């Protein structure tokens, strides 16, 4: 169990999770997924220990896929307060292929989440939240990109986390706008290197790129993830790595959603004012749990929750 600390943000913290709600199609089977759900389903049991809540911000079609995702939100006790619905577009689908060595190749079809709209309820919750997470995928379409930028630029959240996800390559100008408004950034080794290439960084290694961009954009800290190798935190005090973490692997386990779980662990540790070491440990614990399970959003059992609470 991590060291006990008081919630430094205040009572009943509210966190927003923005982006692509999709149906993950894996080996011909459909299951609820998308980074906002994966992240929120992992964070919600932890926030509830503080009386807090996580709201998913996305857009669904009026179809079977939308029903599957609505049921998943309900199962994870995630309120649909900021969930948008449309009859003009179908719910997004992510075609996932798991390679022999465990890598996952994704193909994201156009979907309703490409049209997430800025609206008054979202503006109100952006002003009220203490934490915000969004990935880079919504930057692929003008509508969802515009809403995401508005969310980052108007939110009063003290933790505005940007999660790199380069299944498509955003324009440098868009990435720069998000980084200017973000406080924390997370990505894999490969994603940091790609980000450095897009932004023409002088550095060419992941940790050095994260350090360069942390300084350039006045970020509080950055997290570099490396699968089973664990996470490295980079901030003004330098680099902090953790110890290896593992859980018994389900026979049908796959790594889809593990990075989103790591982001949830990091967010919770930040909300609680945990030490640098505990931030890395929280990310490693939830990331390892997600990787040990056969679902994108498997939920967090009490035994795992209590390791962080």
Predicted regions and their residues:
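Conserved N-terminal subdomain of the carbohydrate kinase-like
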Residues: 12, 23-25, 48-136, 306-309
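Conserved phosphate-binding/catalytic region of the ribokinase-like
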Residues: 1-16, 203-309
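Hydrophobic anchor at the start of a short beta-strand
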Residues: 53-54, 80, 158-160, 222
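Active-site metal-binding loops of divalent metal-dependent hydrolases
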Residues: 20-21, 137, 164, 261
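Structural alpha-helical scaffold elements that stabilize or flank donor/cofactor-binding regions
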Residues: 124-125, 177-178, 215
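Short, hydrophobic/glycine-enriched beta-strand segments
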Residues: 13-20, 161
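Conserved beta-alpha-beta core of the PfkB/ribokinase-like small-molecule kinase fold
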Residues: 131, 135-208, 229-230
